[in-house]
């Protein structure tokens, strides 16, 4: 099976969809971004511009290789960011710098900036330093292709409830997702995958128990 057909897009946010291009299949690590063509295919699948909007990609193999490398580095930074948020910590500064590097590569750009809590009243109320998302203007480049993904990651940092950032409850699945359900009780990456398999396994165990 073509590994591109294994792309899934039900994480609830673009950044986590990219993160889910690397996972375990059983005990084997599986990376779905093996070539520049894989990245272009993934971008097209999520409706992001690729070769058509950035001719320098289709006309320059080196630029396509840069795109692959940058996508993989961004994916690793997203992993470190969500792990930090789940641990109730600010993302490492170098991951914020990496996001900002991509966020500023577009005609309409964005940047994560530090908001320092200085007033005694705010400090007494338990308010802590945080990151805020600001708009800036900058020039475009090949990195601009990845800006919507970096923007998605930045919005996870500034807007998402860390409690809602989860990994699938199935022990052999590493999919991340943002739980946007009303109940906040989503456990599975997808009911059609891990959810139904877990229910079937539970039913089989009950049927196998001696009466």
Annotate each PLM feature.
Residues 133-211:
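Cys/His-clustered metal-coordination modules, chiefly Zn-binding fingers
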Residues 1-164:
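Short helix-coil boundary/hinge micro-motifs
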